[in-house]
Amino acid sequence: MLDERGALARGAAEAIRAGYEAYQAERARITARARGRFEARDWAGAQRDARERLDLRDGVVHRTVGEVRAELGGAVQDREVWRRAKEAFEAVAAARPDAEIAGSFFNSVTRRVLTTVGVDPAIEFLAADAPPPREDPPQHRAFAREATTEALLARILRAAPISAPFEDLARDARLAALELDAHVRGLPDRQPIDAVELARPVFYRGKGAYLVGRIRRGRHLTPLVLALAHGDRGVALDAVLFTEEDVSIVFGFTRSYFHVALERPRAMVAFLSTLLPLKRRSELYTGLGYHKHGKAELYREVAQHLAEGDDRFVPARGDRGLVMCVFTLPGLDVIFKVIRDRFAPPKQTTRREVMDRYRHVFRHDRAGRLVDAQEYEHLAFPAARFSPALLEELRTECGDGVRVAGGEVAIRHLYAERRVTPLNLFVREADEWTARQAVLDFGCALRDLAATDTFPGDLLLKNFGVTRHGRVIFYDYDELTRVTDCNFRDLPGAGPGDGDDGWGGGPDAGYDGGDPPFYVGPADVFPEELLPFLGLTGRLREVFLRAHGELLTGRWWRDIQARLRAGEIVDIFPYREEQRLRHAHP
C-alpha cells in the first residue's frame, strides 16, 4: 500500500509540475508581448493581453485539477498521498528560481481538490517551507556617474531595451537632469550621485513603460523611476520620480499589474524592497503580476501578525455596510469583507451580482482608483481573536458562510483589501486645507474612473477612501457598473444646453426630487441630481462645484461615453500632471 501511495503521489506531483510549467511558459509568452505592444502603440492589444494573463492561471489550475483527479482516482481524498505528493513536488521545485511561485500553484491545486478549511501545513507550502535564500545574480544594471547628470541620464535612455525611436532623447535627458539635480541639492547631505542602478527588465503597464531602480549616493539609496510614454512623434521620458511616496504610488494597490519579464521573482521583490521598505512583500508580488502568490503572502502576513500580537478583529471604522460585514485588526492595515446573508433595503442586488462585480474589478483597468481585493475561501481564525460584538454580527448577519465551532471561526468566503480612511470621516476630521485637497481629488477620481468605463453607482462619500498618500479611491463595488451601460439623462426642464449651468436639479430644473413625473429606466442616471448624494456642504461643496461642476451635467458623461465607444484609451498617469516633464519645463 505504501508503494502504491508513493507511486500515486509521484504521479500527482508530476501532473502539477507539468501544469505549472505550462502556466509559466504561457505567462511568459503573454508578458513578452508587452514590449512589442508599447513599441507599436497597440494599447488595445495591451489591454487584451492583461485580461488574458489574468484569466490564465485559473484555467490552468482547473485543467490540472482534472488531471490530478484522473491520476489519483479513488485516492484523491487520501491525505497521506497528498503529504507525499508535496514532498515529491518540493524535491523538483526547490531548485527552481521561482520556487515560491511553484509552491503557491501546488497549494491552489490541493485546496481546489480537498476544499481545505484553514491551512494544512502537511499538504500545503507555508513560508517556513521556503528554501533558504540563494545567492541570486544581480537584478539590476549599474550606470556609474558621468561628468554631468544629463550625460548619465542620456546613457541610461540610450541603453533602454526599447527599439522604438525617442522623439528627442537629448531634450529628455536635459529636463530630467534639471529635476534630479535640484532634488539632490535639496537633500540634507548633498552627497553627489555615485551610480544609478536600474532593474534589467522594463516594467510595462497600460500605455506606460517604466525603468525602475535606485540612485546610489555613498551609503544612501534613493528610489528612481523613469516613466516613458510613446506618442505620435516617438518615445519620450514623461516623468522622473525619485521620492519613496511617488514611487510607492506607481506600485500602488489601486493599480493594475505590471507586465515584466522575470526569472527570479523573489530576487526582484528583494530589490524593490530596497526602494520601498514600507511595501509589504505581498503587495510587491501582486504588483509584479503574481497575484495568487501575493494573496498567499498576505495570508501569511495576517497569520504572523496574529501569532506575534494580541489585538482582536473588530468592526472597521465607518458606516455599517448594507452588503458587507467589514472588520479589521487594529495593528494591521488590512480590512476583511464578508457578504451578508441578506441585504437591507434599498439594496436590490444579489450575492452573485456582488461577486461578479468584484471579479469585474479584478479584470479591469483600476486606473489607480479601485482597491485591489484578494478573494479567499475556507479560511479559519481563532474565535478568541474576535471581539464579542463582531462575532455576534458574523453569526447573525453572515451565518450562511460563517461557522463558529471548536474555538475557530471558519469563513467560507471573504475579500481582503488595504485599509484606508473613509472619505466622509476624512473630510470631517481633517483641517480645512487637507479636506479641500481630498474633495478635489474625489472629483479627479470620478474622472479617472469614468475614463476607464467605470461608474461607481453609489457616490456617497462613505464608499470612497483616502490612502496614506492622500489619494481618493473607491472600494464599494456592489452598485458599480460600466459608464457605457448607463443612460445619462437631463432632467426635464433643465434649461438650454443639456443643463450646462453645471449643477441643476434645483427649482429651475422643474423637478423637486420627489416621485418623478416622467419615466425613469433602470439604467437611467441624472447627473444633475448627484450633488445631494455626495454629502458635501458649505465650502467643500463650493470647492467641488468650482473644479468639477461639469460632472453634474449629462453632457459631460455622454461625451466620455462617446469617446469610450469609439475605442479611445484615455491617458491616466500614476503621477501628478505637474510632474510631467514638459509641464514642469515648458
From Swiss-Prot:
Compartment(s) where it occurs, according to its Swiss-Prot or TrEMBL record: Cytoplasm
Source superkingdom: Bacteria
Disulfide-bond pairs as recorded: none
Molecular-function GO terms, alphabetical: [isocitrate dehydrogenase (NADP+)] kinase activity; AMP binding; ATP binding; phosphoprotein phosphatase activity; protein serine/threonine kinase activity
Keyword Glycoprotein on entry: no
Pfam families the UniProt entry points to: AceK_kinase, AceK_regulatory
Residues of the active site: 372
Keywords: ATP-binding, Cytoplasm, Glyoxylate bypass, Hydrolase, Kinase, Nucleotide-binding, Protein phosphatase, Serine/threonine-protein kinase, Transferase, Tricarboxylic acid cycle
EC number of this enzyme: 2.7.11.5, 3.1.3.-
Binding site for ATP: 316-322, 337
Protein's GO biological process: glucose metabolic process; glyoxylate cycle; tricarboxylic acid cycle
An example Gene Ontology CC term for this record: cytoplasm
Reactions it catalyzes: L-seryl-[isocitrate dehydrogenase] + ATP = O-phospho-L-seryl-[isocitrate dehydrogenase] + ADP + H(+)
Main subcellular location of this protein, as a coarse class: cytoplasm
Keyword hit for Nucleus: no
Signal peptide: none
Function: Bifunctional enzyme which can phosphorylate or dephosphorylate isocitrate dehydrogenase (IDH) on a specific serine residue. This is a regulatory mechanism which enables bacteria to bypass the Krebs cycle via the glyoxylate shunt in response to the source of carbon. When bacteria are grown on glucose, IDH is fully active and unphosphorylated, but when grown on acetate or ethanol, the activity of IDH declines drastically concomitant with its phosphorylation.
Family the entry assigns: Belongs to the AceK family.
Alphabetical list of PANTHER family matching this protein: ISOCITRATE DEHYDROGENASE KINASE_PHOSPHATASE, PTHR39559
Entries under NCBIfam families matching the protein: PRK02946.1 (NF002804)
Protein name: Isocitrate dehydrogenase kinase/phosphatase
